[in-house]
């Protein structure tokens, strides 16, 4: 229950917490990607940030173009300040859509990707030493699947899962797929 305080009108927030909560705050800062850039922080603190320079028009254009490309509405397109921010947001959304459901990560993950899942999205099972039909069996067995996460290619092994093989099992369970 650390206090959150708005700083100015630039959508920048400061979290002040006791040293007891510092490890949790640091883990959030380190793994989620939801942090302000040093350039934005400097401009905000000095009062030199221009609201028109915050990119609202550019974000609207990007949302509109992505929505048209994927045949969805612009409201369905979520933009994040960083790749890790997007991974955090996708995992959080998966947890809200399928609370308590099983989560699986296929192939070797980037450390922070796995940490986001473990720390902020619940328990996740990591499978790296199997492939193809074995992945299908892992997905099909057990509790209903909430989300499957993978990286293409995996880092550092540069492997890619066989989506043609696993997607029918994921769809059958109603699970979400998150691909980085």
Question: Which stretches of residues belong to each language-model region?
Answer:
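Conserved N-terminal alpha-helix of the aminotransferase class I/II PLP-enzyme fold
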Residues: 1-85, 93, 106-120, 125, ...
């Amino acid at each position: 229950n650390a206090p959150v305080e708005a700083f100015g009108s630039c959508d920048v927030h400061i979290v002040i917490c006791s040293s007891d909560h510092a490890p949790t705050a640091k883990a959030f800062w380190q793994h989620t990607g939801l942090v302000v850039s040093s350039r934005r922080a400097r401009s905000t603190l000095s009062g030199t940030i221009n609201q028109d320079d915050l990119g609202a028009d550019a974000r609207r254009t990007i949302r509109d173009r992505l929505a048209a490309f994927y045949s969805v509405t612009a409201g369905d397109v979520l933009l994040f300040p960083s790749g890790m921010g997007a991974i955090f947001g996708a995992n959080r959304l998966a947890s809200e859509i399928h609370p308590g459901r099983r989560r699986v990560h296929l192939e070797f993950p980037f450390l922070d990707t796995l940490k986001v899942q473990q720390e902020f999205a619940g328990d996740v099972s990591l499978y790296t030493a199997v492939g193809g039909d074995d992945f299908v069996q892992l997905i099909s067995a057990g509790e209903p699947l909430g989300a499957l996460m993978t990286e293409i290619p995996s880092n550092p092994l540069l492997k890619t899962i066989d989506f043609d093989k696993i997607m029918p099992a994921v769809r059958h369970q109603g699970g979400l797929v998150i691909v980085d």
